[in-house]
């Protein structure tokens, strides 16, 4: 039997309390449901350091719980090591992408492929908007986008 190669993905947004923890939790559930979680290293992080150590926004936790998904994530900032250890760094908007590309240019031997998670959306919604100043419906929109994008991403790289 061929040995499975472990792949890794880091989901990134501005503060790591709304969008990226939702994407991380959605992707964890997808790979768990498909019995391939042992083949993946999955995490999420922030381009900023504002929320380091904080739990996800209660509205994000509630949205995930409504879909039967739990998370124990604590916010962290993206590190230089992430660019060397992760295969994929998937972010939510153009600002995240700019910040990550800038940081990656300072890293020797960057191996991560840095992309917008929305680039995998079959509905072609490239940007996953920050729901922080929005309402529960905005968090649900983020969740639905993450489900579509994570499914398509997994299908492509599996």
Curated annotation (Swiss-Prot):
Quote the EC number: 3.1.3.48, 3.1.3.2
Localisation: Cytoplasm
Q: Which UniProt keywords apply?
A: Acetylation, Cytoplasm, Hydrolase, Phosphoprotein, Protein phosphatase
Modified residue annotations for Phosphotyrosine: 132-133
One Gene Ontology cellular component term attached to this UniProt record is: cytoplasm
A GO molecular function term, named singly, is: acid phosphatase activity
Name the Pfam families on file: LMWPc (PF01451)
Activity control summary? Inhibited by sulfhydryl reagents.
Q: How is it modified after translation?
A: Phosphorylated by LCK. Phosphorylation at Tyr-132 increases its phosphatase activity.
Task: Show the active-site residues.
Answer: 13, 19, 130
Q: N-acetylalanine is carried by which residues? A: 2
The outcome of changing residue 63 to S is: 2.5-fold increase in activity
Spell out the PANTHER family in the cross-references: LOW MOLECULAR WEIGHT PHOSPHOTYROSINE PROTEIN PHOSPHATASE (PTHR11717:SF35), LOW MOLECULAR WEIGHT PROTEIN TYROSINE PHOSPHATASE (PTHR11717)
Protein's job: Acts on tyrosine phosphorylated proteins, low-MW aryl phosphates and natural and synthetic acyl phosphates.
Subunit and partners: Interacts with EPHA2; dephosphorylates EPHA2. Interacts with EPHB1. Interacts with the SH3 domain of SPTAN1.
The name of this protein is Low molecular weight phosphotyrosine protein phosphatase
């Amino acid at each position: 039997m061929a040995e499975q190669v472990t792949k890794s993905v880091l989901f990134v947004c501005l503060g790591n309390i709304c969008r990226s923890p939702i994407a991380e939790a959605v992707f964890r559930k997808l790979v768990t449901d498909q019995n391939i979680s042992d083949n993946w290293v999955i995490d999420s992080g922030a381009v900023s350091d504002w929320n380091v150590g904080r739990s996800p926004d209660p509205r994000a936790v509630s949205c995930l719980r409504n879909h039967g998904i739990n998370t124990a994530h604590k916010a962290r900032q993206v590190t230089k090591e992430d660019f060397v250890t992760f295969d994929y760094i998937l972010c939510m908007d153009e600002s995240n992408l700019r910040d990550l590309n800038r940081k990656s240019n300072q890293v020797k031997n960057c191996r991560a492929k840095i992309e917008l998670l929305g680039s995998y959306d079959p509905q072609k919604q490239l940007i996953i908007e920050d729901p922080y100043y929005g309402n529960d419906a905005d968090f649900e929109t983020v969740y639905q986008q993450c489900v579509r994008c994570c499914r398509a991403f997994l299908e492509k790289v599996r």
